[in-house]
Every structure is written in C-alpha cells, then in structure tokens.
C-alpha cells in the first residue's frame, strides 16, 4: 500500500516536471503581451506552443527560444491582428491552460465527420468541379481548407451525409467518392498530375500542419513558379556553425500571421530540432533565425541537404502568401451552396488560390482568395459583377487587418531588456554568449 502511494507521488512529480509552466505578463511591455513558457525538452513542444498562439489568430511580433539540452525557455511577444495587447481574461486563461496541457499530446478529434485528403494539379475551376462532385454524391462539406502552390493543390475536407447528418462509413460509397474526385484531379488525362485521394474517419492532426505535410509529400517545393523566380517572396540562407555543431537557418520575408508556425512546422516535419531561435519584426518585414540539429544531434551535412532545406522553407512561407482578393461569404448553409458559388467564380474566370470553409449553427462562413487566370489581382468591376450574382450582402470583399508595427520601438526595446534581465537564467545568458541575440530588439 505504501509502495502504491509512493508510485502515485512519483507519477505526480514526473507530470509536474514535464508539464510546461506558463507565465503571461501584460505589464512589462506597453505594446505586446508577453507569454513565457518553461518546459522540459521534447520533440514538437515548440510547434505545439506556436500552434496554440496562431490558432487564436495572434501576431507574434518577437520571440526568443533557447534550450540547454534538457530544458526549454520560450518567450513570445504577441498582439491581436490589430496590434493590440491581449486583455480578454478568457483568452489569457485559454492560452495558459492549452500550453500546459500539450504535455499529453492529444490528437484533434473531429466527432461525427469523415476526413477527405486530396492532392493534385491546380487549374481554374478545379474547386468548382470538386464541390459539384461532392454535392452530387450527397456529401455535406462542414469544414475545409485548400492551398495552392507552384501549380499543385492540397486540401483537407470534413464531410457528413447530407440526409442523415452522420459520418460516411460505407466502404463502397467511400470508394466511389475517392474515384470520382481522383478523376476530377487528374483532369484531361494529365499523366503528370499524380492525383491522390484519401478518406478516413479517424481523428486527425492539426489541419494546417497536415496541409504542409501533403504539399511536402507532393514535392511542391521542386516546382518553383516563374512568378516567384522573378520576385522571390522569401530569402532563406543556411550555414553551419562548426564550433557549436549547429546549422544556422535565416528566413527573411514579409511579415504575416502564422509565419512562425509555417516555418517551425516544416522544420519539425523534416525532423530537425530547434535549440535556439530569435524572431524579430519591423514594419512589414520579419527576420527569423534558427539554430538547428538533426534529432541525433548532428548538423546539416551536405550541400544537397542544405539546398533542400532552403527549398522547403521557401515553399512553406509561399504556400500561405496572400495572393489575390479576399472574399468572405456568409450564407445560410444548404446543399450545393459551395458548388453554386465556386461555379460562379469559374464562369467568370476567377481562380481560387486558397479557401477556408466553416459551418456553425447552419450558417456557412467561407473565405476565398481569388485571382484572374494569369494569377494577378482581378479587375474591380469583375469582382462586383460576381458579388451581384451571388448576393452583395452575402459576399463581401474583405481586407486583412494591417500587421501593426511601430517604426521606432525604443520603448519596447528597453522593456524587452528588462524582461531579459528579470529572467536572469543560465539559458538566457547562453543566448548572449552564443551570439544568438545581438541586441534586445
């Protein structure tokens, strides 16, 4: 009996030691909320923390990540999309509780839905054809996300039966859905399309992480578009620091929401461990620096591997780049709604480059990023014509909130210095000793 009590206390101690400690500070910095995370080191812990922050549509203005090999210390400077500090206590509690529970590594469960994964060759009208097939097969699209990049498309769609509202479990019906969608993705006998479909009713991982994985598996990073060759959206460099046994990765690009998630997600899925990192934003620009190793502790070992890391990180940033006009559709949900809307896009020469579909309480809230056939921003008159056909009150042109930055962050720099001094830990001294932080800005 005494042994059982001892084991219970030991188990509690292990859980307490491995559970991340979160401190949220709204007083030290006037322009951002500081989120500090202390945790024992394990694979994926950084990605999970960043994922929680980005899923709340928070902007990470600055971040400092450091590890002594067994312990992590991460500090994030976050705001909402309008550049305001976080004052909603329910949001602050959610952040704290969510990060503290990632130790248990639970998968995302989608109750009562069937998950559909698709990859193939992108073309104008593809989304319209996909939704037309699903409508014809009495599939109700509840949630979905679709990305396009370098001529490829990846999508994760959650379905239920239109009539019963239940998940689709019948193997014959699932096979029919997969077959018809694969025909759509293949197009006119395109032997190079390499279309893939997969239907599952199991719990799924984070949908945006899965989209990155689908694009990576499809090797979209090898098909750099002429548009990106002319005007690179992101500059990535990789160098080895032989003395310390690190590979140093620098990413410079335009700042946007979820940027840090996209980069850390890709590094994690490529099985690199981030030991130290600094993230800084100024105006609309972002600079990210990572000190990484393989899981076995070795740095990048060849020129081919170095080039692959560069290509994959460029692709990770470009996949979510804001291209085209953002249209938001809010409409009572009904069977065939998505097929009707996307058919109107196709008939008017609009190409959908990215999509986010969600349904709540019988109301559909959908986001479409559209371009013309050449990948350029569509003419305003064309957009208004499409809105009139779908419904001016239902379909609106929506601008993303401007990323909030101050030109002179002198006050914040002083406050950041105070944060670093107050931490006073060996881990933070390592950041300076290793030369990972040249200044506190």
From Swiss-Prot:
Record-level Gene Ontology MF annotations: amino acid binding
CDD domains: ACT_ACR_1, ACT_ACR_2, ACT_ACR_3, ACT_ACR_4
Gene Ontology biological process: response to abscisic acid
Record PROSITE patterns: ACT
Induction text: By abscisic acid (ABA), and cold and salt stresses.
Record function comment: May bind amino acids.
Protein name: ACT domain-containing protein ACR8
Originating species: Arabidopsis thaliana
């Amino acid at each position: 009996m005494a042994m059982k009590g001892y084991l219970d206390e030991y188990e509690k101690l292990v859980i307490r030691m491995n559970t991340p400690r979160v401190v949220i500070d709204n007083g030290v910095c006037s322009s951002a909320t500081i989120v500090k995370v202390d945790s024992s080191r394990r694979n994926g812990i950084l990605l999970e923390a960043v994922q929680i922050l980005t899923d709340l549509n928070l902007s990470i203005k600055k971040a400092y990540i450091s590890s002594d090999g067994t312990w992590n210390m991460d500090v994030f400077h976050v705001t909402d999309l309008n550049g305001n500090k976080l004052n909603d206590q329910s949001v602050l509690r959610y952040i704290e509780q969510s990060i503290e529970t990632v130790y248990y590594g639970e998968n995302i469960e989608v109750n009562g839905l069937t998950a559909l994964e698709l990859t193939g060759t992108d073309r104008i009208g593809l989304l319209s054809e996909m939704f037309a097939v699903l409508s014809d097969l009495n599939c109700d699209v509840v949630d979905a996300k679709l990305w396009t990049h370098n001529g490829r498309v990846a999508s994760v769609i959650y379905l239920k039966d239109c009539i019963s509202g239940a998940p689709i479990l019948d193997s014959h019906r699932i096979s029919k859905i997969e077959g018809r969608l694969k025909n759509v993705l293949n197009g006119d006998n395109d032997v190079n399309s390499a279309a893939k479909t997969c239907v599952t009713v199991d719990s799924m991982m984070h949908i945006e992480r899965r989209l990155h994985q689908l694009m990576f598996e499809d090797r979209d990073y090898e098909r750099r578009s002429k548009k990106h060759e002319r005007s690179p959206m992101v500059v990535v460099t990789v160098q080895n620091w032989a003395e310390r046994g690190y590979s140093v990765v620098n990413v410079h690009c335009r700042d946007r929401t979820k940027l840090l998630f996209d980069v850390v997600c890709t590094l994690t899925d490529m099985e690199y461990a981030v030991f130290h990192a600094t993230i800084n934003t100024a105006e609309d620009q972002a600079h990210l620096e990572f000190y990484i190793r393989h899981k076995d502790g070795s740095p990048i070992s060849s020129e081919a591997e170095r080039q692959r890391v560069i290509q994959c990180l460029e692709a990770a940033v470009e996949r979510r780049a804001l291209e085209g006009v953002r249209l938001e559709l809010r409409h009572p949900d009904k069977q065939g709604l998505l097929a009707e809307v996307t058919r109107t896009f196709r008939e008017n020469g609009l190409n959908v480059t990215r999509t986010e579909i969600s349904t709540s309480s019988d109301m559909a809230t959908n986001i479409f990023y559209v371009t013309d056939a050449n990948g350029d921003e569509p003419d305003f008159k064309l957009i208004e014509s499409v809105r009139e056909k779908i419904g001016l009150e239902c379909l609106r042109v929506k601008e993303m909130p401007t990323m909030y930055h101050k030109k002179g962050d002198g006050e914040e720099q002083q406050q950041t210095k105070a944060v670093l001094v107050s931490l006073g830990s060996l881990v933070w001294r390592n950041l300076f000793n290793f030369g990972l932080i040249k200044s506190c800005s």
